[in-house]
C-alpha cells in the first residue's frame, strides 16, 4: 500500500487534484475524511496541511507527497526526502522586503540586531547566517506585511508571486531567499522497497505524462499529397508527422502531428499557405 499525502486546501490543491484525475488516479469523494481511496486499490490518499507534508514524507508517515519547495526547506527536510518531479507551477519567491520609505535598499544595509518578521523562521535564519547577519526573527502566522508599520519589525521575509501584494502594502523587495515551485517528493526508505518504488514510479510517470501533454497540441489535417515534403519541413513533430492515405481522394493525405503549443499559431498559418484543409488543433490528455 502506498500513502500519498496531498494538500487539504490552498491554491495548489485543486490543480493537483485535476492533474491526478487526468493521470487516471481518480480520488473518491472524501467529504470531511482525512483519507480517501483511489481507483488503484494499492494507492490511498491522505489530506494534510501543505506545510506538514514534508515532515510526514521524511518520517515515513506517507510514502510520497506533493507540496511546495519553500515548505520542504522550512521543515529542513530537503536532504531527507527524494525529489521526483517539479510541477513547475505554484511558483513563488520567499523574499526580504522593507518599507518603501526606509533606508534599507539591499542586503548590505541590514545590521545585526534588526528585527525581521516572517512565517518562515528556519529558512530566513539559515539565509541570514549565510550572510553573517544576526537579526532577531519575529515569527508570525499571517499578515506579515503589516509588521514594519506597527513597530513589530524593521523588515519582513514573505512569499510573493508577482510582487503586487508587496507594492500594495508599500514594501520593496531587497533580496530573494529561495525560489519555490510545487514538488513531488518521496520517502527514501519507500524508494528502496522494490514494490513501493514500482508503484511510486507509476504515480510519477502518470503525473509527468499529464504535465508534458499540457505543453503540446495534436494537429490533424488533410493536405495535398505533393506537399508532403514541405509539410515535413514545417512540422517535424515529436517523431515526425504521421501521414496516411485518404481513400476517397488519392491526391490528398491525412496528417497527424504533435507539436509544442507555442508553435501552433505559426505552424497552422504556414500549413494553410501550402493548401492544408480541415485543420484541427486538439488538446492532449497524456503523453507517455
From Swiss-Prot:
What's the top EC group for this one? transferase
The catalytic activity of this protein is classed by the Enzyme Commission as 2.4.2.17
Alphabetical UniProt keywords: Amino-acid biosynthesis, ATP-binding, Cytoplasm, Glycosyltransferase, Histidine biosynthesis, Magnesium, Metal-binding, Nucleotide-binding, Transferase
Q: Name one GO cellular component term.
A: cytoplasm
According to the UniProt entry, how is activity regulated?
Answer: Feedback inhibited by histidine.
Recorded catalytic reaction(s): these are: 1-(5-phospho-beta-D-ribosyl)-ATP + diphosphate = 5-phospho-alpha-D-ribose 1-diphosphate + ATP
| Swiss-Prot/TrEMBL GO biological process terms | L-histidine biosynthetic process
The answer to whether keyword Transmembrane applies is: no
Transcription found in the keyword field:
no
Tell me the domain of life.
Answer: Archaea
- Subcellular location, in the record's words? Cytoplasm
- What cofactor does this protein call for? Mg(2+)
Pathway assignment? Amino-acid biosynthesis; L-histidine biosynthesis; L-histidine from 5-phospho-alpha-D-ribose 1-diphosphate: step 1/9
Q: Name one GO molecular function term.
A: magnesium ion binding
Main location class:
cytoplasm
Supply the Pfam families for this chain.
HisG, HisG_C
HAMAP family in the record: HisG_Long
Q: Which family does it belong to?
A: Belongs to the ATP phosphoribosyltransferase family. Long subfamily.
Q: Give the function comment from the record.
A: Catalyzes the condensation of ATP and 5-phosphoribose 1-diphosphate to form N'-(5'-phosphoribosyl)-ATP (PR-ATP). Has a crucial role in the pathway because the rate of histidine biosynthesis seems to be controlled primarily by regulation of HisG enzymatic activity.
Q: What is this protein called?
A: ATP phosphoribosyltransferase
Organism listed in the record: Methanococcus aeolicus (strain ATCC BAA-1280 / DSM 17508 / OCM 812 / Nankai-3)
Amino acid at each position: 500500500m502506498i500513502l500519498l499525502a496531498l494538500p487539504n486546501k490552498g491554491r495548489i490543491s485543486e490543480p493537483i487534484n485535476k492533474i491526478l484525475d487526468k493521470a487516471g488516479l481518480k480520488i473518491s469523494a472524501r467529504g470531511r475524511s482525512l483519507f480517501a481511496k483511489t481507483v488503484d486499490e494499492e494507492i490511498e490518499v491522505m489530506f494534510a496541511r501543505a506545510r506538514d507534508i514534508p515532515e510526514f514524507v521524511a518520517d515515513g508517515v506517507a510514502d510520497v507527497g506533493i507540496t511546495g519547495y519553500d515548505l520542504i526547506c522550512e521543515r529542513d527536510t530537503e536532504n531527507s526526502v527524494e525529489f521526483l518531479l517539479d510541477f513547475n507551477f505554484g511558483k513563488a519567491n520567499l523574499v526580504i522586503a522593507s518599507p518603501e520609505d526606509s533606508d534599507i535598499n539591499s542586503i548590505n544595509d541590514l545590521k545585526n540586531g534588526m528585527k525581521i518578521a516572517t512565517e518562515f523562521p528556519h529558512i530566513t535564519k539559515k539565509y541570514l547566517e549565510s550572510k553573517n547577519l544576526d537579526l532577531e526573527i519575529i515569527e508570525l502566522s499571517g499578515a506579515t506585511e503589516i509588521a514594519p508599520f506597527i513597530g513589530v519589525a524593521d523588515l519582513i521575509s514573505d512569499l510573493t508571486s508577482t510582487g503586487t501584494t508587496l507594492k500594495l502594502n508599500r514594501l520593496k523587495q531587497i533580496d530573494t531567499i529561495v525560489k519555490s515551485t510545487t514538488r513531488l517528493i518521496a520517502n527514501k526508505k519507500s524508494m528502496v522497497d522494490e514494490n513501493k518504488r514500482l508503484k511510486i514510479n507509476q504515480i510519477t510517470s502518470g503525473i509527468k505524462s499529464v504535465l508534458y501533454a499540457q505543453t503540446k497540441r495534436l494537429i490533424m489535417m488533410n493536405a495535398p499529397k505533393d506537399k508532403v515534403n514541405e509539410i515535413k519541413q514545417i512540422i517535424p513533430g515529436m517523431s515526425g508527422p504521421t501521414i496516411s492515405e485518404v481513400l476517397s481522394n488519392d491526391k490528398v493525405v491525412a496528417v497527424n502531428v504533435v507539436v509544442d503549443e507555442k508553435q501552433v499559431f505559426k505552424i497552422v498559418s504556414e500549413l494553410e499557405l501550402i493548401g492544408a484543409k480541415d485543420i484541427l488543433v486538439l488538446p492532449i490528455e497524456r503523453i507517455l
